[in-house]
């Protein structure tokens, strides 16, 4: 939360956040916190530029990313000296929620790792872990969709839509 406030005050507008910049700082801070210097775990990010989100979107997404990256760093690479955590944020082409009069943009956030993966018998819809319950609740709060891909590690895919603000013509806040 402190990082969100810091990023807000750096920007020109105090009600929207450049989310890509925030994700970079958050992920780098998490990697430092878990001090992975003895392991060769890499962070790879592919982030949409000018993804300006209001606080109703930025705060839940920030908590989701924090939970997923922390989980990868704590659990994905036991006994392994190398690996990768990847974060991707992009606008979805032909999003299902686009309307002409109320411009809504669909986004995809994917957080993945190439670690040991998540057991097939773990159903995220009924998972008992507090982290998964929190992620599920926050995705629901965003009126989004959560998908788990178990190929080559774990990949959480979150699809969500945001209404664009009409008061900024060149870089609309979403």
Residue locations for each model-derived region?
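Glycine-rich nucleotide-binding loop
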Residues: 117, 151-157
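Glycine-rich/acidic phosphate-handling loop/turn and adjacent ATP-lid/helix
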Residues: 96-132
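Short beta-to-alpha transition helix within the HATPase_c
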Residues: 3, 16-33, 88-94
């Amino acid at each position: 939360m402190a990082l969100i406030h810091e990023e807000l005050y750096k920007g020109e507008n105090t009600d929207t956040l450049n989310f890509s910049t925030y994700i970079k700082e958050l992920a780098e801070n998490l990697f430092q916190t878990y001090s992975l210097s003895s392991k060769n775990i890499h962070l790879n990010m592919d982030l949409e530029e000018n993804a300006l989100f209001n606080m109703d979107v930025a705060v839940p997404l920030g908590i989701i990313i924090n939970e997923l990256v922390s989980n990868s760093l704590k659990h994905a690479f036991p006994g392994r000296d190398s690996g990768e955590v990847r974060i991707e944020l992009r606008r979805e082409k032909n999003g299902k929620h686009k309307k002409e009069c109320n411009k809504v943009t669909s986004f995809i956030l994917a957080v993945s790792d190439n670690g040991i993966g998540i057991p097939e018998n773990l159903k995220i819809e009924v998972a008992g872990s507090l982290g998964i319950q929190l992620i599920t609740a926050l995705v629901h709060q965003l009126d989004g969709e959560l998908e788990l891909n178990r190929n080559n590690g774990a990949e959480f895919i979150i699809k969500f839509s945001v209404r664009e603000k009409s008061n900024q013509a060149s870089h609309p806040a979403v």
